C-alpha cells in the first residue's frame, strides 16, 4: 500500500499534478500510504471514461447487469477479512465491528440492487380514441459519489449499488482521510466483469470535490458528510442543475420510557453512542431518560461504560478504537471541556487514553454527561465522538417537543413496552430514520435519509432507484395527424 493512484477505466492512472497526500493509521500515527491527488486532468479523464463505460453498461440487458453486480457482492464477501483489516488500518475502528458490518452490509446492498436491475420499469395508460402513453425510467448518466471517512467502503457501496443497477456510471471520491478501500472496491468491480469506466475512483481533498460539483458533464452528486459541507456541495451543484442526494449530520434523540428494562435501555444507549467510537451520523447522542428510572439507568450505564475495552483496533477483543485523527480528537476533547464549563456532570470518561501503548493514537474514553440541559453545547452540536448526554424528562408531550428542538432530523428512537405509545411518539418525531426498541439497524431494503437539515433524498430501498433514474413520457397517437394548418 506504499503508493496509491487514481483508478480510471479499469486500471491505475498516474496523476499529473505531482501533488500527493498521506493517509495515517489513527491508532498509531504511522503513515499507511501516500496517495496521488487528482486535479482537473484526472477528473476529465474519469468523466470521459465514464461516458464510454456508461454507454456500454446501459446497453447491456438488466439481467446481465444484475449478474455482474451479484458477482461483485460474492467477491466482496470472499475478501471480507482482508478488506475489513484494511478498513481498520485507515479508520481506527475495531476489527470486531468492521469484520461483521462494514463490508458485509455493503455487499448486502450490492446484492439487493443486483436483484432489482430487471425490476426498473415504467407505466402505460390507454387514453382512448387511439391514444396512449407510456413512461420509461432511464439512467441519469454519470453520477458522482463523495464519501465520508467513518464507513468508507460501505458508503461507496451504498452509492454505487443503486447507481449502477439503474445503468449509470459512477465517479467516486472517498474522503482524503480514508482513501484506500474504495480502490479495492473498484478492483473487485473490474474482476466481476463491470465494463471499464463504469466505476472510477479519484482521490483528493475538498478541492477535488469542488471540481466534481462544478463539472458540467456530471449529472448527479450523492454526498455523505457534514451539514456545512453539504450545503456547499449543493450550492455548487445548482450551477449546472445537478440532481443531489445529501446524507448529512444528526443530533438524534432516543427516548426511554420507564417500562423499559434498565439493562436493555443501557444496552441501547451504549450502542447508539459508542459504536465506531461515536463516529456515526445516526448516533443517539441525546438520551432522554424518564425521571423514574434515571438513577438506576445512570448507575448501570457508568459501570458498563467504564468496563469497555479500549485498545488496538486489530485485537478482536477491542470494543473502542481510535478516532479518525488527532485533529478530530482535539475537537471532541474541546466539546468535553465545553460541557464541563456549561455545568454538565461528568459521569465517566472524558479524557484521552494514553496507557498501554496508545499514546501515539487518537483514543478518547467513552464519555457520559448527566445533569444536562437542552442548551448545552454538547447537547446542541454534532460532536461525532463517544460523548453521550443524558437528559431527564417526566412528560411525553414535553419530551417530544424537546426531541424535535433541533435543526437536524436524521434519526430518532423510542424505547418502551407500550406499543401504542411507541407508535404515537414515533409519529410525532421529526426524523427520517426511526427505531422502536432498536438502534442502528439499516437493512438494504429500507430507505434511509434525513428530515430538515439532515439531508435530501434517500439511500437504499426501492425508492433510491428513483433518485438515480429520470422519467421519460412517450405519447402515442394511432390516428392521422390533426392540424389547423
UniProtKB/Swiss-Prot annotation:
Keywords of this entry: Metal-binding, NAD, NADP, Oxidation, Oxidoreductase, Potassium
Catalytic residues identified in the record: 159 (charge relay system), 247 (proton acceptor), 281 (nucleophile), 459 (charge relay system)
Cofactor(s) the record lists: K(+)
PROSITE patterns per the UniProt record, alphabetical: ALDEHYDE_DEHYDR_CYS (PS00070), ALDEHYDE_DEHYDR_GLU (PS00687)
Binding of K(+) 2, residues: 241, 452, 455
Matching NCBIfam families: BADH, PRK13252.1
Name the record gives this protein: Betaine aldehyde dehydrogenase
Species whose genome carries this gene: Marinomonas sp. (strain MWYL1)
Amino acid at each position: 500500500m506504499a503508493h496509491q493512484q487514481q483508478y480510471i477505466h479499469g486500471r491505475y492512472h498516474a496523476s499529473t499534478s505531482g501533488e500527493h497526500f498521506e493517509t495515517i493509521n489513527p491508532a498509531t500515527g504511522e503513515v499507511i500510504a501516500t496517495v496521488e491527488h487528482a486535479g482537473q486532468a484526472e477528473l476529465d479523464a474519469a468523466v470521459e471514461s465514464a461516458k464510454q463505460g456508461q454507454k456500454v453498461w446501459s446497453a447491456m440487458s438488466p439481467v446481465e447487469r444484475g449478474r455482474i453486480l451479484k458477482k461483485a457482492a460474492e467477491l466482496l464477501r470472499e475478501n471480507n477479512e482482508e478488506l475489513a483489516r484494511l478498513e481498520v488500518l485507515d479508520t481506527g475502528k475495531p476489527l470486531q465491528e468492521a469484520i461483521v458490518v462494514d463490508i458485509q452490509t455493503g455487499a448486502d446492498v450490492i446484492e439487493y440492487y443486483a436483484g432489482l436491475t430487471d425490476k426498473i420499469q415504467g407505466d402505460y395508460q390507454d387514453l382512448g380514441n387511439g391514444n396512449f402513453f407510456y413512461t420509461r425510467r432511464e439512467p441519469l448518466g454519470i453520477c458522482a459519489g463523495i464519501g465520508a471517512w467513518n464507513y468508507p467502503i460501505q458508503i461507496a457501496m451504498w452509492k454505487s449499488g443503486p447507481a449502477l443497477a439503474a445503468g449509470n456510471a459512477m465517479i467516486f471520491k472517498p474522503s482524503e482521510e480514508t482513501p484506500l478501500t474504495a480502490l479495492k472496491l473498484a478492483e473487485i468491480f473490474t474482476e466481476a466483469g463491470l465494463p471499464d469506466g463504469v466505476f472510477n475512483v479519484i482521490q483528493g481533498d475538498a478541492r477535488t470535490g469542488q471540481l466534481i460539483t462544478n463539472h458540467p458533464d456530471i449529472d448527479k452528486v450523492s454526498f455523505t458528510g457534514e451539514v456545512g459541507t453539504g450545503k456547499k456541495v449543493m450550492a455548487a451543484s445548482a450551477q449546472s442543475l445537478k440532481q443531489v442526494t445529501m446524507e448529512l449530520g444528526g443530533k438524534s434523540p432516543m427516548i426511554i420510557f420507564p417500562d423499559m428494562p434498565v439493562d436493555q435501555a443501557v444496552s441501547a444507549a451504549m450502542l447508539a453512542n459508542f459504536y465506531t467510537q461515536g463516529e456515526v451520523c445516526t448516533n443517539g447522542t441525546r438520551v432522554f431518560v424518564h425521571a423514574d428510572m434515571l438513577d438506576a439507568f445512570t448507575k448501570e450505564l457508568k459501570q458498563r461504560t467504564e468496563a469497555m475495552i479500549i485498545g488496538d483496533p486489530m485485537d478482536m477483543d477491542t470494543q473502542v478504537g481510535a478516532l479518525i485523527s488527532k485533529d478530530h480528537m482535539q475537537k471532541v476533547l474541546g466539546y468535553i471541556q465545553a460541557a464541563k464549563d456549561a455545568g454538565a456532570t461528568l459521569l465517566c470518561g472524558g479524557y484521552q487514553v494514553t496507557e498501554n501503548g496508545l499514546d501515539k493514537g487518537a483514543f478518547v474514553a467513552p464519555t457520559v454527561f448527566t445533569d444536562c440541559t437542552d442548551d448545552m453545547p454538547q447537547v446542541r452540536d454534532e460532536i461525532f465522538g463517544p460523548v453521550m448526554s443524558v437528559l431527564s424528562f417526566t412528560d411525553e408531550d414535553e419530551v417530544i417537543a424537546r426531541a424535535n428542538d433541533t435543526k437536524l432530523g436524521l434519526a430518532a428512537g423510542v424505547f418502551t413496552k407500550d406499543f401504542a405509545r411507541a407508535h404515537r411518539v414515533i409519529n410525532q418525531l421529526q426524523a427520517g430514520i426511526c427505531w422502536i426498541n432498536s438502534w442502528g439497524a439499516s437493512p438494504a431494503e429500507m430507505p434511509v435519509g434525513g428530515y430538515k437539515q439532515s439531508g435530501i433524498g434517500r439511500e437504499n430501498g426501492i425508492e433510491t432507484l428513483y433518485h438515480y433514474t429520470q422519467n421519460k413520457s412517450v405519447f402515442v397517437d394511432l390516428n392521422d395527424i390533426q392540424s389547423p394548418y
